Amino acid sequence: MGKKMMTTDGNTATAHVAYAMSEVAAIYPITPSSTMGEEADDWAAQGRKNIFGQTLTIREMQSEAGAAGAVHGALAAGALTTTFTASQGLLLMIPNMYKISGELLPGVFHVTARAIAAHALSIFGDHQDIYAARQTGFAMLASSSVQEAHDMALVAHLAAIESNVPFMHFFDGFRTSHEIQKIEVLDYADMASLVNQKALAEFRAKSMNPEHPHVRGTAQNPDIYFQGREAANPYYLKVPGIVAEYMQKVASLTGRSYKLFDYVGAPDAERVIVSMGSSCETIEEVINHLAAKGEKIGLIKVRLYRPFVSEAFFAALPASAKVITVLDRTKEPGAPGDPLYLDVCSAFVERGEAMPKILAGRYGLGSKEFSPAMVKSVYDNMSGAKKNHFTVGIEDDVTGTSLPVDNAFADTTPKGTIQCQFWGLGADGTVGANKQAIKIIGDNTDLFAQGYFSYDSKKSGGITISHLRFGEKPIQSTYLVNRADYVACHNPAYVGIYDILEGIKDGGTFVLNSPWSSLEDMDKHLPSGIKRTIANKKLKFYNIDAVKIATDVGLGGRINMIMQTAFFKLAGVLPFEKAVDLLKKSIHKAYGKKGEKIVKMNTDAVDQAVTSLQEFKYPDSWKDAPAETKAEPMTNEFFKNVVKPILTQQGDKLPVSAFEADGRFPLGTSQFEKRGVAINVPQWVPENCIQCNQCAFVCPHSAILPVLAKEEELVGAPANFTALEAKGKELKGYKFRIQINTLDCMGCGNCADICPPKEKALVMQPLDTQRDAQVPNLEYAARIPVKSEVLPRDSLKGSQFQEPLMEFSGACSGCGETPYVRVITQLFGERMFIANATGCSSIWGASAPSMPYKTNRLGQGPAWGNSLFEDAAEYGFGMNMSMFARRTHLADLAAKALESDASGDVKEALQGWLAGKNDPIKSKEYGDKLKKLLAGQKDGLLGQIAAMSDLYTKKSVWIFGGDGWAYDIGYGGLDHVLASGEDVNVFVMDTEVYSNTGGQSSKATPTGAVAKFAAAGKRTGKKDLARMVMTYGYVYVATVSMGYSKQQFLKVLKEAESFPGPSLVIAYATCINQGLRKGMGKSQDVMNTAVKSGYWPLFRYDPRLAAQGKNPFQLDSKAPDGSVEEFLMAQNRFAVLDRSFPEDAKRLRAQVAHELDVRFKELEHMAATNIFESFAPAGGKADGSVDFGEGAEFCTRDDTPMMARPDSGEACDQNRAGTSEQQGDLSKRTKK
């Protein structure tokens, strides 16, 4: 066998094996495992063959629970089957995992070990998820590196086939799954040679088949269940030997030796760490560094975690060990110790011999950095205080568990390793370009290469830091670069925010992308700290105006290839001419599908970069550059002590005491960021403005503030604070201004695009030309009182004079979701509950520390919460039940008070509140009166009522989520909640893909669209969720598209919120995953075209109209204008199929057009047919409810819980279970 080297990441290395060894894969996206499924789906679309000569059969399911069920079924029917998951996804699979292991089926689950959402969600790596599944009966095999992920994946598949025991192969999320390394991969023929064909044949022979049938999954009684559970023992006893055997067989092919437990370190070690996962790489690097100094230390790497084989553990442990520290990357509150520690302790206790001192340590939760200095601290603790149940990597100033860490500990990377940092802006291409650079270096030199990428939680436009290493020796540094030879800053705003040169080596290279072309410019703009570091460390300092080059060649903000060219020119890893040639080849490979124009723009950028790099010779005076005195903006203590350190990349240094134990964060912290990362921002041209407020309405980041001011409020305004006479009779006496928030603007340009006048009132200009003038103007405008009462709140213009209670989110520039949500908060924000499904809207909506939801000037605002991906509807339903129960109790108290304590004004206010408690305006009106009248009241019924003042105003419960939630994983709960009849509002932001996990197909994805998990174009149609829900008949349903009709959107919101029952509003939302060819600055235009073309028809279904004898269905959009082909081809998700599968593309587009035509005709028919006209229900009311007469035995919605009858409070299931005669004797029925 010849060696085949590949520069790849852990996910791809694993998928390479899983694809080869599997016949079926059932998948569902979850970060950070998704790319395994994406790669497998892409290979299958290309017709790649596995070791059986087949193309993998791969299907996306509606959830991880569904994927696990499909895996179970496929295994039961005799196909070797795999899946890929992590975190909450793995938890959803646990019930099926018990079934799969109980039936001895040889499936393999590949898991990118990730944190579990507890006090907060974390998409990053630790071992909480895999430990939560350790009791399922799956064998568990751990990998520590990218190479091991490949090798152990193969061992897992081979051992599963022979042992009949399913395997969970896991490796650290992000740290291994997304780390790029140069590794050796095996050919499929070599893998096939290792398969036990006899065991495979036996598996197939035992599978379910009507040709030789048997029964599985029986129900067993107490007489036999126990025995059946123990019958599998012999299979598990054989697993360790089988795994060890296949480790040896893989070693015979690769030369890489593995054991169930591997030991590295001094043969006579006295201090030994036991750990598993990527931490082992860092620990081994430290051991190699300290071994030369005679340190008697070692490490046991756990590979086979389940079954845990004590004999193999003791065979690996040096007899000289006096102190052992077991490191766990999890937290199990209330347990005497974490899982691996308890396993090790149990092994020693069962052995019954003298025990060394055994310590427990916790590290690395949520991908918390685990550095060589921390490893040194763990070893020092074993020879010093021997602190037990410690934490390392944090400062625990609450319970005192943390170990001290000396961050000045030595650089332990192998000598000659070159280390680089690239500070980029999300979506500027930096990360993608660095992945290419690593692959170019790895594939075209003898050097070892490593790449790792850290991000904040912004959807795009956030900070990205790429950490690259390369050298002549293998790289085991599974931690961030902290001593860099080369630092590149790709956004000039960063030099004033972050300490980007922290840790750079003396004589290192610093490359800046900025428009500052002269030393005078640099002296003016560079902070003193940066200048001092440059001069004192004698750095080589270069600048390149990458944005200008990108703009000139037509790339916009995509500066990646320009900065990569600079890197190859300065780093000296490859001869520069060769590097440029390889870079251009990579451009053709990466962008060839997007057309020659895109390729040429990128190659032109490379050519221009070669001649545009400018070296600066700086003066010695920079060594002592005086520190600036910055005026701190008015902020609160939480911002200064918590938010600011996190924003400046210093969050690792915050102690435990800085945080609330339950994970809560205050609202409105995003307003303090002021990142200033846009390239261009809008400039207001007053003389062209028609004062329509549409620009503010569509702004994705709430960066446009329409201002109404009285003359006296403009006294003392900045000189260029231009204000016009406000138009409209209601606004007589007011001045009007559009104020741009330049530092929070993301520069998408939607505002300028939709500005109605021919001569635009908003013109995009470079940020540097606007900042100095508009920052003072914004500060002044923000102090002018909001004029929220002058125009109707639910009008287009009036809505934008309401204070937005969601602003400056972490969404992508031009996001199609955020404008909708901001407007909803402007209409109802001060009384909203928001139950948000996990997804884009939860990540841009609540990623610590920047909270875009905010309070108004009275301290009121959306109460926002996130539970899980799958249960947002139920979560919001629970909020509604809580409000119902608590306000019902309040109403009971008010009624009792009227009978006893209340008199005069209090009595009148209570009567008014009781009559209008379910009306938001009246409940607030009388509630405000009660607050004044009962102020200071402490005792009696009135005291109780006063204590419940936060319940006076009727609350508005909203459930937010994307199409992945509503159409797929959360559909069951959504359907139940809508069917309940309860008063909740559901708002679905339909981007037609799983946006948050990177653009995978959902059931909202239309026919012919290319998405991840649908690489060959989706072959089935879009789920018609709106019409499905309409079949209930008592749910308000509407579709909206802001870019087509803002008025219709506002009308829908008003109707949906006022409807006394469930409402569902589905909004068409643009997304970067759709690949808008004109860019996200055309989001509103695309929304408009979507409706005009017939792709996204607008309609409303209001059950209240049926009660009045009217047609509840109203079609709000016109007939398609014939532009659907143009609409589809303006998006890469449709256009890209032309290049890969042209015949399929043509057929599928025709199919889409036919589906849209049929649907619109059906909608027209519904709008033209009123079946309610001739038999409106007797007693129909305007609100849609029906009076069925006194004493009628019906479940009702008004003033009663869902499952109680109005007269008796007895359980009521709306007769879903049938009559008592139909049900029979319930006592004899089998329960679940």
From Swiss-Prot:
Thiamine diphosphate binds at E64, E817, C840, G962, D963, G964, W965, T991, E992, V993, Y994, S995, N996. Keywords: 4Fe-4S, Calcium, Cytoplasm, Disulfide bond, Electron transport, Iron, Iron-sulfur, Magnesium, Metal-binding, Oxidoreductase, Pyruvate, Thiamine pyrophosphate, Transport. Residues 680-709, 736-767 form the 4Fe-4S ferredoxin-type domain. It catalyses: 2 oxidized [2Fe-2S]-[ferredoxin] + pyruvate + CoA = 2 reduced [2Fe-2S]-[ferredoxin] + acetyl-CoA + CO2 + H(+). It is found in: Cytoplasm. One of its GO terms (biological process) is response to oxidative stress. SUPFAM superfamilies: 4Fe-4S ferredoxins, Pyruvate-ferredoxin oxidoreductase, PFOR, domain III, Thiamin diphosphate-binding fold (THDP-binding), TK C-terminal domain-like. Residues 1216-1225 have a biased composition (Polar residues). Residues 1197-1232 are annotated as: Disordered. The record marks T31, E64, R114, N996 as: Important for catalytic activity. It comes from the Bacteria. This is Pyruvate:ferredoxin oxidoreductase. The gene is por.
